[in-house]
């Protein structure tokens, strides 16, 4: 099956504005609400209380119930960790998520988020890999928000994404018949404070 350009991206998370606060939630169509069927739990309980059921069957059913409860708990823990990570990203990039201006992205690496949430860097990497977030200004890939920092002429640390954006703007505005040389690009970016 070939890729179709008009395929929609279904986000994993949603960021919304509530006054000055940014709210983060899971996109519920992507996550199932899991629970153990109440009538099945009652059947297991009744079987455990029954003297007519052999010990091996009772143990088997108890083990299956415990496994199901563990699975539901693990999924809830995973969702909780995912939300903590994305909330930390939104907090670190508050201005960007509020305004949607790429120039407001601050340098941020996986380690920053991992330390803030209290998880391993690999956990943050797995949570943000191939995950999308819907924002008031569009849907974006979470990993694209992570950038290294570069110190500009004023001594401020800025995101390398800001510099990439500035280069793209300069190249878009140049005469395509006579593109800028590398030295000219450096001079133009230097004039802009980079």
Task: Identify the residue ranges that each predicted region occupies.
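Alpha-helical scaffold/interaction cores of sigma-54-like transcription cofactors
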Residues: 1-194
């Amino acid at each position: 099956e070939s890729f179709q350009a008009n395929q929609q991206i279904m986000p994993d998370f949603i960021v919304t504005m509530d006054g000055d606060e940014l709210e983060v939630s899971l996109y519920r169509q992507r996550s199932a609400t899991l629970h153990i069927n109440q009538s099945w739990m009652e059947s297991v309980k009744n079987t455990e209380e029954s003297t007519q059921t052999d010990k091996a069957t009772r143990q088997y059913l108890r083990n299956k119930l415990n496994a199901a409860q563990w699975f539901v708990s693990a999924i809830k823990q995973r969702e909780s960790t995912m939300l903590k990570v994305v909330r930390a990203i939104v907090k670190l990039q508050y201005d960007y998520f509020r305004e949607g201006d790429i120039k407001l992205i601050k340098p941020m690496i996986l380690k920053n988020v991992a330390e803030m949430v209290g998880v391993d860097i690999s956990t943050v990497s797995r949570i943000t890999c191939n995950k999308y977030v819907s924002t008031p200004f569009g849907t974006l890939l979470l990993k694209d928000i992570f950038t290294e920092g570069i110190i500009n002429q004023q001594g401020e640390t800025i995101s390398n994404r800001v510099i990439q954006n500035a280069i793209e703007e300069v190249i878009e505005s140049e005469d395509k018949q006579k593109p800028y040389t590398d030295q000219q690009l450096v001079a133009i970016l230097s004039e802009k404070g980079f």
